[in-house]
């Protein structure tokens, strides 16, 4: 189990790797809380952590899990989120090498996240988990995050695993895994209240983010935590009213010394107006205005999961875990549609119709797995992970069109997709030379059966996909500080309901992922370098003009990621961080566009931050840079009159944050952060975003934030 104290740091963690008695946790909690107010005593009680069996290749998504991990990986802590002035999940990811974000709202409600050049729209090529449970609407048939039921205030950290996890975490793992880790239940009952107020230059009303959490252990065997997050207001543009409510409850129940149940329940409701893109002329006139008055969004989701953990008395150590999860979700996009000529989404033309896309999702899954450790104290060790998963998805997929001038509503699409997906996986981490060298072969098999029904045409078609997905990771501890690693894994993205379009014959998108790199870790100083390559077969690409998908064939994504953190021994109050990504993402299919850059991919990405602590205050200057990118496969440089094609210019954004504890003792603390995002008011934009794909989509300008957080 995990718990945290008033400083927000996880003191003892358990779960798949180890089990602690409640007495030991109480001792650790008391020790760490007294340490806030007093020096360490001579006779301290120390809780030793012994990791014997590991049931997850990514562990608990802690900083400690990164050091020897056999792939490129970044963990963003709550402290880093605060100091870099991140106001949303997508904003927190901006400085991670290989991640690019199209921030269409400034509120984080509908993030568009690209990993290593994969398409960003609705984060459909990024596999998101929350506490290890799939977050996406449908892991197989609809990977696009057109509901993103997560808010930054409820997170403790974010784990971005770019390589090495495909065997256990699939499908849709071409770009790796992003695990959102919620705040753990504290051992001593704790309440947290925070309010974050953001004012945008040019905005009409502020955006307010209120968060409340209370929880702890009610007895030696039962813990409970309740959370609520309310986001309300506007961003920097007209037609951007936002109202989000996010409620979570989690519980832990120790059935015995060897058995535990963890439960999670969430209700998420979001409504937001979508200001849409602007024509180049309107953008130059006033980038804060909106020309898409009919564009709106609503999303609702009820999610749950129950996990049973049982330590077993065989091998040197063994553990059984059974995870069940599910959700019932609804979402509705509404947007203006022009059917009178020109591009349907041209923001300079008036809409003739209003389209809606109501969709409903019912998902259920169960995943039992076993972890077994052999060879304790020997020169050769083995950590086996064997698991299987069943997921059922029921998707209703509609499209309606209503003339603004009046008339009957048409239903161009009325589809249904029922999916039964079975997966099995096995891996064995073999430790050689006293775990100096770790080699992990693994295999995942996916068997997906889809039944597609076009209710309007009264047609039904079946589609079955079976794929064997091998993987191999290697990590070598050169010294206590240096680790070299390499991995190769085959990844899958199952056929999507929007791709099938009634044919029932579309195949999967497949890719081979390769990485080789090295990592240095010494106290707070670290460095990582990774070369990566993704060989993608049969990549499908959305064409907004025809609203169909094209198979663009083979694509190649390759590059170099660098990241470093330096804390000088002579000046520990200073912390310097930097990252760089070089990405060459190209079309490889024979034809006129072979060798061209994939749309929306920047070759160069930089991230940086510098924090200096003095007189009880932390000051941080941070930022990111992305080079220019193209909009189409032909790599057209000149912008056309509508803004549908043309280069997207490079941009550089600076942020500033000042944080200090206004009050702190062993019973509680009150912390204040003052931030300025986009310090120099860089004006930049994106293209090609979902329901408004034509024109320039403005990114947020300068904003000012006051954040107060009280824990007691």
Regions found by a protein language model. Name each.
Residues 204-274, 296-309:
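Transmembrane beta-barrel wall of Gram-negative outer-membrane proteins
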Residues 133-162:
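Short acidic/polar hinge/loop motifs at secondary-structure boundaries
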Residues 254, 260-261, 266, 297-455:
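Face-selective signature of the C-terminal outer-membrane beta-barrel domain
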Residues 165, 182-216, 228, 235-237, ...:
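Short strand-turn segments of transmembrane beta-barrel domains in outer membranes
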Residues 370-373, 433, 439, 533-535, ...:
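Gram-negative outer-membrane beta-barrel transporters
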Residues 628-634, 660-712:
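C-terminal beta-signal and adjacent terminal beta-strands/loops
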Residues 70, 90-137:
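Extracytoplasmic beta-strand/coil segments of soluble accessory domains associated
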Residues 307-337, 477, 483-489, 508-569, ...:
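Membrane-embedded beta-barrel scaffold of Gram-negative outer-membrane proteins
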């Amino acid at each position: 189990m995990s718990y945290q104290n008033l400083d927000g740091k996880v003191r003892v963690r358990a779960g798949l790797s180890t089990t602690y008695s409640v007495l030991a946790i109480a001792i650790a909690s008391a020790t760490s809380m007294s340490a806030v107010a007093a020096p360490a005593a001579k006779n301290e009680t120390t809780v030793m952590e012994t990791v014997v069996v590991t049931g997850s290749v990514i562990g608990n998504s802690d900083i400690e899990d990164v050091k020897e991990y056999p792939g490129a990986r970044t963990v963003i802590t709550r402290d880093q989120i605060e100091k870099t002035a991140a106001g949303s999940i997508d904003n927190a990811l901006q400085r991670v090498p290989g991640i690019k974000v199209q921030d269409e709202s400034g509120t984080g409600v509908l993030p568009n996240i690209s990993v290593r050049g994969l398409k960003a729209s609705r984060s459909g090529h990024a596999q998101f988990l929350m506490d290890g449970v799939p977050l996406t609407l449908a892991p197989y048939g609809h990977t696009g995050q057109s509901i993103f039921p997560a808010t930054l205030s409820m997170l403790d950290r974010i784990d971005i695993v770019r390589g090495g996890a495909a065997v256990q975490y699939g499908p849709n793992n071409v770009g790796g895994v992003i695990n959102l880790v919620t705040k753990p239940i504290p051992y001593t009952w704790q309440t947290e209240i925070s309010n974050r107020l953001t004012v945008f230059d040019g905005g009409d009303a502020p955006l307010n983010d209120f968060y409340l959490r209370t929880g702890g252990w009610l007895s030696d065997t039962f813990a409970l935590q309740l959370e609520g997050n309310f986001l309300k207001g506007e961003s920097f543009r007209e037609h951007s009213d936002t109202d989000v409510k996010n409620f979570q409850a989690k519980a832990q129940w120790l059935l015995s010394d060897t058995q535990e149940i963890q439960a999670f329940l969430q209700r998420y409701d979001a409504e937001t107006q979508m200001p849409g893109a602007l024509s180049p002329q309107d953008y130059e006139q006033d980038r804060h205005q909106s020309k898409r008055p009919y564009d709106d969004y609503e999303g609702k989701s009820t999610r749950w999961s129950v996990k049973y953990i049982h330590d077993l008395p065989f091998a040197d150590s063994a553990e059984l875990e059974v995870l069940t999860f599910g959700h019932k979700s609804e979402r509705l996009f509404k947007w203006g549609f022009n059917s009178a000529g020109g591009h349907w989404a041209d923001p300079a033309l008036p809409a003739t119709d209003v389209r809606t896309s109501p969709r409903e999702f019912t998902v259920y899954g169960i995943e039992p797995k076993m972890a077994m450790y052999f060879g304790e104290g020997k020169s050769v060790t083995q950590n086996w992970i064997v698991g299987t998963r069943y997921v059922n998805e029921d998707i209703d997929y509609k499209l309606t069109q209503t003339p603004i001038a009046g008339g009957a509503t048409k239903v161009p699409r009325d589809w249904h997709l029922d999916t039964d997906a079975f997966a099995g996986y096995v891996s064995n981490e073999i430790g050689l030379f006293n775990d100096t060298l770790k080699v992990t072969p693994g295999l995942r098999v996916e068997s997906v059966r889809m039944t597609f029904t076009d209710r309007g045409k009264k047609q039904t078609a079946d589609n079955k996909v079976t794929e064997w997905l091998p993987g191999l990771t290697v990590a070598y501890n050169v010294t206590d500080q240096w680790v070299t690693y390499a991995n190769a894994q085959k990844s899958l993205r199952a056929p999507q309901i929007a791709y099938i379009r009634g044919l029932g014959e579309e195949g999967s998108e497949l890719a081979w992922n390769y990485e080789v790199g090295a990592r240095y870790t010494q106290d707070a100083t670290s460095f990582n370098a990774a070369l990566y390559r993704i060989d993608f077969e049969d990549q499908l690409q959305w064409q907004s003009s025809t609203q169909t998908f094209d198979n663009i064939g083979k694509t190649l994504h390759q590059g170099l990621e660098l990241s470093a953190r330096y804390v000088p021994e002579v000046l520990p109050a200073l912390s310097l961080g930097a990252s760089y990504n070089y990405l060459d993402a190209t079309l490889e299919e024979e034809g006129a566009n072979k060798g061209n850059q994939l749309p929306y991919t920047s070759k160069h990405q930089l991230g940086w931050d510098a924090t200096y602590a003095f007189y009880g205050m932390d000051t941080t200057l941070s930022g990111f840079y992305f080079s220019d990118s193209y909009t189409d496969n032909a790599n057209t440089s000149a912008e056309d009159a509508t803004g549908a094609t043309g280069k997207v210019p490079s941009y550089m954004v600076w942020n500033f944050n000042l944080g200090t504890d206004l009050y702190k003792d062993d019973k509680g603390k009150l912390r204040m952060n003052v931030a300025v995002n986009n310090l120099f008011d860089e004006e930049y934009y994106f293209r090609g975003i979902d329901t408004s794909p034509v024109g320039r989509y403005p990114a947020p300008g300068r904003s000012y934030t006051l954040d107060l957080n009280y824990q007691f």
